[in-house]
């Protein structure tokens, strides 16, 4: 749920917490002197995004930075890794950068994105499943977006689909039988 400004990202990784309510991020920037935390709005506008536990790491170890405003940080130009945490809104995680980068998102067991009726992935993603998580990777992309779901939502979809099909059969079968009887007529 971020959009970066003023930084060229090389790699970005996001780890969604169990339960899907928060995430932690690690973003590499090269020859950058600032970084902004933003959501992309429906028209591409920048909407400030609240993050916490922000830290900057580089050749200086745990480097210092200044806040320009509550959503933009400045630091000495260089290559860094920015670590932070944020909240996931409505099982939806998105991000965009000023230049192409490689992004990976790790979902914990119990969260999934592979059912197109419940989940969503932006184009160019590769999904792999391993023992401890579900990994989604985009290579050389300027933006990513995903919507994940829980097993409960999958069961609700199955129940709704089953009820819908039963209702369809209860309406359609008598209609077809009546039509067949009328077709034979005296």
Please describe what each predicted stretch is.
Residues 3-186:
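Lumenal/extracellular ectodomains and adaptor appendage modules
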């Amino acid at each position: 749920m971020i959009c970066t400004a003023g930084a060229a990202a090389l790699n970005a990784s996001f780890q969604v917490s169990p339960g899907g309510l928060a995430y932690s991020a690690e973003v590499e920037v090269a020859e950058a002197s600032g970084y902004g935390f933003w959501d992309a709005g429906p028209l591409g506008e920048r909407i400030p995004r609240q993050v916490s536990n922000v830290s900057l790491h580089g050749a200086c170890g745990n480097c210092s930075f200044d806040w320009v405003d509550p959503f933009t940080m400045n630091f000495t130009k260089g290559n860094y890794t920015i670590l932070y945490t944020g909240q996931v809104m409505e099982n939806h995680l998105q991000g965009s950068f000023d230049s192409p980068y490689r992004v990976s998102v790790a979902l914990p067991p119990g969260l999934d994105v592979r059912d197109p009726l419940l989940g969503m992935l932006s184009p160019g993603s590769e999904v792999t499943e391993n023992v401890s998580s579900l990994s989604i990777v985009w290579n050389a992309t300027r933006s990513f977006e995903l919507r994940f779901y829980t097993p409960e939502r999958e069961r609700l979809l199955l129940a709704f689909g089953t009820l819908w099909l039963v209702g369809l059969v209860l309406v359609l079968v008598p209609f077809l039988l009546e039509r067949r009887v009328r077709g034979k007529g005296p």
